[in-house]
């Protein structure tokens, strides 16, 4: 779970090309949602990660500090425990949006817009900032970035499998 989440974080800065923490958060989470639309096995892994108590606890304890750094300016007086608790709410939203497939009535753009709005509202991001961030995220080529992340994930898994079996690495 840790590797799955940390590997995409490095790609986010390259995709966005900016250092606005709210935009980076929105892009990172939008990439997760996009990945689940492109790969059913990864959708199952993400949904499981946001369902099982052991992986949920890992997610919450490892993201609360990061969430505090991003959103504390919008929530004066909050403490780390507040962001841990709010991550429980945003994690539930994330799981729900990951589990629901896009369809004729619910495009990826609609899904990302609604998802990001829900999460940023939890963290008291002002509406004007939400609109700005969502517009920028929807303008990104998340499809290509998600495909690259999926391919890199598959390559790492294959390399790990080959190493575990004592097979030479593919060239």
Where are these regions (language model features)?
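Amphipathic alpha-helical packing segments from all-alpha helical-bundle domains
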Residues: 27, 49-102, 106-118
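Short, surface-exposed acidic
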Residues: 19, 76-83, 128-131
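HTH DNA-binding helix-turn interface
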Residues: 1-3
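C-terminal peripheral helix-coil segments that are non-catalytic and often amphipathic
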Residues: 69, 73, 103-171
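Short, hydrophobic secondary-structure boundary micro-motifs
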Residues: 43-48, 128-132
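Hydrophobic alpha-helical connector segments
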Residues: 9-42, 52, 60-64
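Phosphate/oxyanion-binding loops and surfaces in catalytic or ligand/nucleic-acid-binding neighborhoods
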Residues: 35, 39, 93, 100, ...
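Short, flexible helix-adjacent loops and helix caps
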Residues: 9, 13-17, 41-44, 71-76, ...
């Amino acid at each position: 779970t840790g590797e799955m989440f940390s590997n995409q974080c490095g790609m986010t800065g390259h995709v966005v090309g900016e250092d606005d923490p709210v935009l980076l958060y929105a892009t990172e989470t939008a990439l997760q949602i996009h990945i689940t639309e492109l790969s059913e096995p990864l959708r199952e892994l993400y949904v499981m990660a946001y369902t099982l108590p052991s992986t949920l606890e890992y997610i919450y304890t490892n993201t609360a500090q990061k969430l505090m750094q991003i959103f504390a300016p919008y929530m004066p007086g909050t403490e780390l425990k507040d962001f841990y608790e709010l991550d429980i709410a945003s994690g539930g939203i994330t799981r729900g949006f990951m589990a629901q497939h896009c369809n004729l009535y619910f495009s990826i753009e609609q899904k990302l817009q609604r998802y990001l709005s829900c999460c940023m509202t939890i963290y008291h991001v002002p509406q004007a900032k939400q609109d700005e961030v969502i517009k920028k995220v929807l303008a990104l080529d998340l499809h290509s970035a998600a495909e690259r992340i999926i391919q890199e994930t598959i390559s790492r898994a294959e390399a790990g499998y080959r190493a575990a079996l004592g097979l030479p690495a593919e060239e």
